[in-house]
Amino acid sequence: MKQYILPVATVIAYSLIPNHFHLLIRTKSETEISELISSQKKQQNTSDFIMQQFSNWFNSYAKAYNKMYNRKGTLFMDFVKRNKAETDDDITSFIFYIHKNAVHHGLCKQIVEWKYDSYSSVISAKQTSLGRTFHINWFGSKEQFIKLHLQSVGLKQKDL
């Protein structure tokens, strides 16, 4: 992720589930990405470059996974489903949905039990490349962030 995604985006939230994952990112400014494209001496528009970075990340992960488990073949479908957060409520809903996803799928009973998402990175004091400050500022405090996530709300499939 550091090599491919972080140069073009800030990771806000993620959740890794056995058969899928969710990732909420904020892409860097067009100027920053254009400078990155120029520094790599490439001729590509910013949107294509961002998608190429994701493609490279998926391929890199698949190769490492296949090597580790002595297997061959693809891990991911040929498309990435994307949703754009249009409002502040969308961002809050996406973060909540992503962090509650393992509970929703019955993989754990409480968010804090799932180790494969960004929730624990937000509440931890350990160093992280996740945008922890974003969460604290967005929700007002770490306590407010935790309080929202303690809600026992059923998730609706919002085409995520």
Where are these regions (language model features)?
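Short catalytic/metal-binding and nucleic-acid-binding patches
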Residues: 1-160
